[in-house]
């Protein structure tokens, strides 16, 4: 089973991706984690990517695409869930070309829908657990408010990502995501239009529901 998942920062995309990964034993390929690995390792591609990430800008395709495609080609036998890529219409087209060229079947594309202002507030309230960044903790969402400065799931220490508190950086990321001409929403639309003739299923989810509500809807459609 091979899945693409779309959703703005703050939509719970990472959480839902982790749940699907666990249920179906998929490789969860998250472009941000790939970037962080390269940045932490001090690779040439990583250092180039960091310059753009620090400014809240889209990392150029000639840096991103080689990283992502390499990981897809070495993924496990149960398939993969690709999270955070493609982020533009150009990347969407190039990814589809690569999948077709390699004979890789795409089974599902998921889009989590969330208004921009709601997404922004969720980002600024997000707290990351030292043990698992996908443990849900957000001071602005009643259902997943942390226990003081401790993770509500495991009790681990919580921290903020600096760019989660930078409104300018958030706005830049959302400018890219919500751009329905060339940005990430346009990339999602590309796959939505392609789905009927390409043979994969396109799933739209209401991101304003609770984690459990979204999960139940998603799992009911991944069949």
Swiss-Prot record:
A GO cellular component annotated for this chain's UniProt record is: cytoplasm
- Renumbered to this chain, region (NMP) spans 30-59
Give the primary localization class: cytoplasm
State the Gene Ontology terms under molecular function. Answer: adenylate kinase activity; ATP binding
Quote the Pfam families the UniProt record gives: ADK (PF00406)
Chain sites annotated for binding AMP = 31, 36, 57-59, 84-87, 91, 161, 173
Keyword list (alphabetical) reads:
ATP-binding, Cytoplasm, Kinase, Nucleotide biosynthesis, Nucleotide-binding, Transferase
**For binding ATP, which residues are annotated in this chain's numbering?**
10-15, 126, 209
Instruction: List locations, semicolon-separated.
Output: Cytoplasm
Region ranges (LID): 125-164
Query: By its UniProt entry, which CDD domains does this protein fall under?
Result: ADK
Q: What class of enzyme is it?
A: transferase
To which pathway does this protein belong?
Answer: Purine metabolism; AMP biosynthesis via salvage pathway; AMP from ADP: step 1/1
> Catalyses which reaction?
AMP + ATP = 2 ADP
Gene Ontology annotations of biological process type:
AMP salvage
Entry keyword annotation includes Phosphoprotein: no
Amino-acid biosynthesis is among the record's keywords? no
Specify the superkingdom.
Bacteria
Subunit field text? Monomer.
Which family does this protein fall into?
Belongs to the adenylate kinase family.
What is the official name of this protein in its record? Adenylate kinase
Q: Write down the species.
A: Maridesulfovibrio salexigens (strain ATCC 14822 / DSM 2638 / NCIMB 8403 / VKM B-1763) (Desulfovibrio salexigens)
């Amino acid at each position: 089973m091979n899945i693409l998942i779309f959703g703005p920062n703050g939509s719970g995309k990472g959480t839902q991706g982790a749940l699907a990964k666990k249920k179906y034993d998929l490789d969860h390929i998250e472009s941000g984690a790939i970037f962080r690995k390269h940045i932490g390792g001090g690779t040439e591609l990583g250092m180039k990517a960091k310059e753009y990430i620090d400014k809240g800008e889209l990392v150029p395709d000639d840096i991103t695409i080689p990283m992502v495609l390499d990981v897809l080609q070495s993924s496990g036998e149960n398939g993969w869930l690709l999270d955070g890529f493609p982020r533009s219409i150009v990347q969407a087209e190039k990814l589809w070309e690569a999948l077709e060229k390699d004979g890789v079947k795409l089974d599902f594309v998921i889009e989590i829908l969330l208004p921009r202002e709601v997404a922004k507030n969720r980002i600024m309230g997000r707290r990351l657990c030292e043990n698992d960044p996908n443990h849900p903790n957000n001071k602005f969402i009643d259902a997943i408010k942390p226990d003081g400065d401790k993770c509500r799931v495991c009790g681990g220490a919580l921290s903020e990502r600096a760019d989660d508190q930078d409104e300018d950086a958030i706005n830049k990321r959302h400018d890219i995501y919500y751009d329905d001409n060339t940005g990430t929403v346009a990339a999602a639309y590309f796959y939505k239009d392609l789905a009927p003739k390409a043979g994969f299923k396109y799933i739209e989810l209401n991101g304003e529901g609770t984690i459990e509500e979204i999960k139940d809807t998603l799992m009911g459609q991944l069949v």
